[in-house]
Amino acid sequence: MDWLAKYWWILVLVFLVGVLLNVIKDLKRIDHKKFLANKPELPPHRDFNDKWDDEDGWPKKDQPKK
């Protein structure tokens, strides 16, 4: 088991290469054109930032300094 203490990083690299190959293989199976053709319509995004747009605390650029 002395070799495992010395070369554990090789096992980690082999594992990561295997994960990377599986990810690439799975991503090749995805048909992005079919997904984009049948993409569901998203509802409009509601946020309440429009209330704060008028209450901007930044000074105006055209105002002279006091």
From Swiss-Prot:
A GO-annotated cellular component: plasma membrane
Q: What is this protein called in UniProt?
A: UPF0370 protein YpfN
Q: Which residues cross the membrane?
A: 4-24
Q: Where is this region: Disordered?
A: 39-66
Instruction: Tell me which InterPro entries the record gives.
Output: UPF0370
Q: Which UniProt keywords apply?
A: Cell membrane, Membrane, Transmembrane, Transmembrane helix
Q: How does the UniProt record describe the way this protein sits in the membrane?
A: Single-pass membrane protein
Q: What is its main location?
A: membrane
Q: Which organism is it from?
A: Salmonella paratyphi B (strain ATCC BAA-1250 / SPB7)
Q: Does the keyword Repressor apply?
A: no
- UniProt biased composition (Basic and acidic residues): 42-66
Task: Identify its protein family.
Answer: Belongs to the UPF0370 family.
Where it sits in the cell: the answer is: Cell membrane
Q: State the organism's lineage.
A: Bacteria, Pseudomonadati, Pseudomonadota, Gammaproteobacteria, Enterobacterales
Q: Which gene is transcribed and translated to give this protein? A: ypfN
